[in-house]
Every structure is written in C-alpha cells, then in structure tokens.
Curated annotation (Swiss-Prot):
Tissues where this protein is expressed: Red blood cells.
Chain positions recorded as heme b binding sites: 62, 91
Biological source species: Capra hircus
Assembly with partners or alone: Heterotetramer of two alpha chains and two beta chains.
Full protein name: Hemoglobin fetal subunit beta
Length: 145
C-alpha cells in the first residue's frame, strides 16, 4: 500500500494535527456537504444549518473520537483491516451505516488537512493521505463484503 517513505510522510504530518479541531471540522463538513449523512446523527441536536453543525459540541466531540480512532489506525498501516475490524462490525451490523460514507469522510479529511496545512500539504503528501483514507474506508467496509 505505502512505501516506508510514504508512511513516514503521513505520520510526520499527522503528528502536527490538532485532532479535536480537525476531527470536528471534518465530521462537520461531511454533514454539511453530504446532508444525507445527518440521519446517523439526528440525536446530536441542531443540524439545521452549516453554522449550527460546525458549532455543535456533539459533532465536534464525535469528530474528535473519529480522528482519535483514525490516529490509532495509523499505527497499524500494514493491517488496517485488523485495526478497524471491530468498528467495521459495529457500523455494519448495528449502526447500518452506508460504507460509502467512510470514503466520503476520508475525502473530506483530506480537504481539511489541505486547508489547514496549505503549502506543506504537497500533491505527493495528498496522494499518500488519499491512499491511507482509502485503505481505512476499505477496512471499515470490510464487514459488508
């Protein structure tokens, strides 16, 4: 999936990520850009506008939780299916989340990282992160197959 150099570049940048801020923004943007994903978060309260979503403390808290889990997965880049097996089972069997949403969230995360890191987020680094988020999305969707 990733060479040693590609892994190092991903881990180096991710070490600079403020998980709380980036996680909250990524989940918030997912809910704004792809409003049908809101159905999984109706219990979060006010999701009536972009401002409401991006300012919602439950969205921010869950976004942090998601990115904390993503961060843990980065420690197992060679076994993403194993790293995310229990979450795949939860999202498939209990939550019934459309696995396409994992891909969408990964793409939104890449956008947020590009926005936050600007020129430091080179096209090569973007390609490396895209490989990672695709791998994570595939691992989360594994139970569905």
């Amino acid at each position: 999936m990733l060479s040693a150099e590609e892994k190092a570049s991903v881990l180096s940048l991710f070490a600079k990520v403020n998980v709380e801020e980036v996680g909250g923004e990524a989940l918030g943007r997912l809910l704004v850009v792809y409003p049908w994903t809101q159905r999984f978060f109706e219990h979060f309260g006010d999701l009536s506008s972009a401002d409401a979503i991006l300012g919602n403390p439950k969205v921010k808290a869950h976004g942090k939780k998601v990115l904390d889990t993503f961060s843990e997965g980065l420690k197992q880049l060679d076994d993403l299916k194993g790293a995310f097996a229990s979450l795949s089972e939860l999202h498939c069997d209990k939550l019934h989340v459309d696995p396409e949403n994992f891909r969408l969230l990964g793409n939104v995360l890449v956008v947020v990282l590009a926005r936050r890191f600007g020129g430091e987020f080179t096209p090569e680094l973007q390609a490396n992160f895209q490989k990672v988020v695709t791998g994570v999305a595939n691992a989360l969707a594994h139970r569905y197959h």
